């Protein structure tokens, strides 16, 4: 009698509940949104750097050309250097477009926090107190997903407000030190605490997107 060859059996993955699937999808969305934010931020910094360099260069030329006059440098900038004015306007439009892109991302982050809160409330409604039910994945209580989402969303909301200020002020700044300060703020994103990536990676690990 011929021996039958058994096929390789692949262990089935545990079936996730509706709430767990939604939380896992949200974690992936967080990862994608943050990557998109970083890409836009890098492009925005390059644009902001060009604006700052142009303003500093223009201011230096005006100071030399108008050394003997009583007019301020910025008063004659557009008249004396119309080509700079056109290029500066284009760069400012690019930076504004970047800001609008970041704003859309932050709005999606807010929505993620809202949907995560909804999942937590649904779990509470169906299963009662958190301490009396098992976690959706490994160790995190359901409410912790909302806490992390809310914290991340607040960080990016504050950072967006700072970037809006930079966009509004940078093109009107002729002072070199102030322009460099604005650039530093944009690049280093002070409201995005060092722990933001740790929060994201912890959430990805908990939901199974990352493995130890």
Curated annotation (Swiss-Prot):
Posttranslational mods: Phosphorylated by CDC7 but not by CDK2.
GO biological process, any: cell division
An annotated Gene Ontology molecular function: preribosome binding
InterPro entries from the UniProt entry: Cyclin-dep_Kinase_2_interact
Sites bearing N-acetylmethionine, chain numbering: 1
UniProt modified residues of type Phosphoserine: 69, 73
Coiled-coil annotated spans: 74-106
Cellular localization per UniProt: Nucleus
Domain of life: Eukaryota
Keyword Coiled coil annotated: yes
Function: Component of the DNA replication complex, which interacts with two kinases, CDK2 and CDC7, thereby providing a functional and physical link between CDK2 and CDC7 during firing of the origins of replication. Regulates ATR-mediated checkpoint signaling in response to DNA damage. Part of the 55LCC heterohexameric ATPase complex which is chromatin-associated and promotes replisome proteostasis to maintain replication fork progression and genome stability. Required for replication fork progression, sister chromatid cohesion, and chromosome stability.
Protein name (Swiss-Prot/TrEMBL): Cyclin-dependent kinase 2-interacting protein
Originating organism: Bos taurus (Bovine)
Name of the gene this protein is made from: CINP
């Amino acid at each position: 009698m011929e021996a039958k060859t058994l096929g390789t059996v692949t262990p089935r993955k545990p079936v996730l509940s509706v709430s767990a699937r939604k939380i896992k999808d949200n974690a992936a969305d967080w990862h994608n949104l943050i990557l998109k934010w970083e890409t836009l931020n890098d492009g925005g910094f390059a644009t902001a750097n060009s604006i700052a360099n142009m303003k500093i260069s223009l201011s230096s030329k005006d100071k030399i050309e108008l050394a003997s006059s009583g007019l301020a440098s910025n008063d004659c900038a557009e008249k004396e250097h119309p080509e700079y004015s056109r290029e500066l306007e284009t760069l400012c439009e690019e930076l504004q477009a970047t800001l609008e892109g970041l704003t859309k991302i932050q709005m999606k982050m807010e929505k993620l926090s809202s949907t995560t809160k909804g999942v937590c409330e649904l779990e509470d409604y169906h299963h009662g107190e958190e301490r009396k039910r098992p976690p959706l994945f490994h160790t995190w209580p359901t409410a912790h997903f909302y806490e992390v989402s809310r914290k991340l969303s607040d960080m990016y909301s504050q950072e967006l407000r700072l970037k809006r200020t930079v966009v509004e002020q940078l093109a009107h700044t002729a002072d070199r030190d102030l322009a460099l300060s604005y650039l530093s703020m944009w690049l280093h994103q002070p409201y995005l605490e060092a722990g933001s990536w740790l929060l994201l990676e912890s959430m990805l690990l908990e939901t199974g997107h990352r493995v130890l």
